[in-house]
């Protein structure tokens, strides 16, 4: 069984037992959270799509860790003008383990 969930403005296809990194969710490590924005649920050949959400469906997950992705380096430059600008960004994430899909 799998589900398509929406969290942090992005969509993810998840199945029970998977781990995935999503945009940061303010929760403690080992806390159980419920993701109720389920866009689709499928099992085998049958797929149930929501309009836009599947009513009564939810996904239970456990927070495994909180962290930061690798740095993305930004470099801006104007040719012949001696202008150079360096920057960087590290995005926060939450790693989840999917425990159950309720449809």
UniProtKB/Swiss-Prot annotation:
Q: Does the keyword Protein biosynthesis apply?
A: no
User: Can you name a GO cellular component term?
Assistant: ribosome
Q: Which organism is it from?
A: Paraburkholderia xenovorans (strain LB400)
Q: Which family does it belong to?
A: Belongs to the bacterial ribosomal protein bL21 family.
Assembly and oligomerization: Part of the 50S ribosomal subunit. Contacts protein L20.
The protein's name in its UniProt record:
Large ribosomal subunit protein bL21
Query: In the UniProt record, what gene is named as encoding this protein?
Result: rplU
Q: Which biological processes are named by the entry's GO terms?
A: translation
Q: Which domain of life is it from?
A: Bacteria
A single GO molecular function term of this UniProt record: structural constituent of ribosome
- What is one Pfam family matched by this protein? Ribosomal_L21p
InterPro entries reported in the protein's UniProt record: bL21-like, bL21-like_sf, Ribosomal_bL21, Ribosomal_bL21_CS
Q: Does the keyword Acetylation apply?
A: no
Name the keywords, alphabetized: Ribonucleoprotein, Ribosomal protein, RNA-binding, rRNA-binding
Against PROSITE patterns, the record matches this protein to: RIBOSOMAL_L21 (PS01169)
Q: What does this protein do?
A: This protein binds to 23S rRNA in the presence of protein L20.
């Amino acid at each position: 069984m799998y589900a398509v969930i929406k969290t942090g403005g992005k969509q993810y296809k998840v199945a029970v037992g998977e781990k995935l990194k999503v945009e940061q969710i303010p929760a403690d490590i080992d806390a159980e959270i419920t993701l109720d924005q389920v866009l689709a649920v499928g099992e085998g050949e049958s797929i149930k799509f929501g309009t836009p959400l599947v009513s009564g469906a939810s996904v239970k997950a456990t927070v495994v860790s909180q962290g930061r992705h690798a740095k993305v380096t930004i470099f801006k430059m104007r040719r012949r003008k001696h202008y150079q600008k360096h920057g960087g960004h590290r995005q926060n994430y939450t790693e989840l383990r999917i425990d159950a899909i309720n449809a």
